[in-house]
Regions:
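Glycine-rich, acidic
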Residues: 62-107
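Phosphate-handling active-site elements
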Residues: 40, 44, 79-81, 141
Length: 228
């Protein structure tokens, strides 16, 4: 991951890893420190504008969030992680798909003079994460990708609603890029060249800070996202 992102491992944090770290052993977690060499490359939320498009990047799977629940599901299954999904992949293997690293993609977009207004990863708070910016915008999601089968499997065996799933997991979309309509086509071409799939999924507008996922009739208010 460090090589792909061209980043150094310069520190870490003490993470809570229940049921993962064996007593008497250590767990390592990393952080990254970077230098922005040009203010033109500084991507901050004040650049967001009404009618900006939301480009969602397709994930490879669950990534590293919501894992406690995936383990709880495995414990209830007679074959555990060896249980096969409807697509023929074993549950355990589906949970181990690699997480996409988008550092080079973002660099390529900037070098192509794509004016990126904001970026947001979609992790442990699901699609709620895209309203991380403090400005008052409503995030309208008009289209979503079909989630990988592992998400349907988790939802079925955990008995979760669409709201709970989209508020916890990436549901097949793990990164959001916000930009002007005029930059969408060129940006998606660069995304494809980098080997990733994208969806011109929606737009933002001035209004109450919330995420509206129209295909699922799910709305997340700002008070459901508590981040430091």
């Amino acid at each position: 991951a460090c090589n792909l992102a061209e980043a150094s491992w310069g520190g870490g944090e003490t993470a809570t890893m229940k049921q993962i770290v064996i007593p008497g052993t250590s767990e390592l977690a990393g952080s990254a420190i970077g230098i922005i060499t040009s203010k033109n490359n500084l991507v901050i939320s004040k650049n967001l504008k009404s009618n900006d498009r939301i480009i969602l990047l397709k994930s490879n799977g669950v990534n590293a969030n919501g894992i406690s629940l995936t383990r709880a599901v495995a414990k209830k299954l007679p074959k555990g992680y060896a249980t096969k999904l409807s697509d023929g992949i074993m549950y355990g293997d589906a949970l181990l798909t690699k997480t996409n690293i988008y550092a080079k993609l973002i660099q390529d977009l900037l070098e192509a003079n794509i004016n990126i207004h904001y970026l947001s990863n979609i992790t442990g708070h699901g699609l709620r994460k895209i309203m991380r910016a403090k400005e008052d915008f409503t995030y309208m999601i008009e289209k979503i990708v079909e989630p990988q089968e592992v998400f349907n499997f988790i939802q079925k065996h955990a008995g979760l609603s669409d709201e709970e799933m989209y508020g916890t997991y990436n549901m097949g979309m793990d990164y959001a890029i916000f930009l002007s309509e005029k930059d969408v086509k060129k940006a998606q071409e660069i995304i494809t060249k980098n080997g990733f799939e994208s969806l011109n999924a929606g737009y933002i507008k001035k209004g109450e800070r919330q995420v509206v996922i129209e295909p699922k009739k799910v709305v997340f208010k700002s008070d459901t996202l508590n981040l430091r």
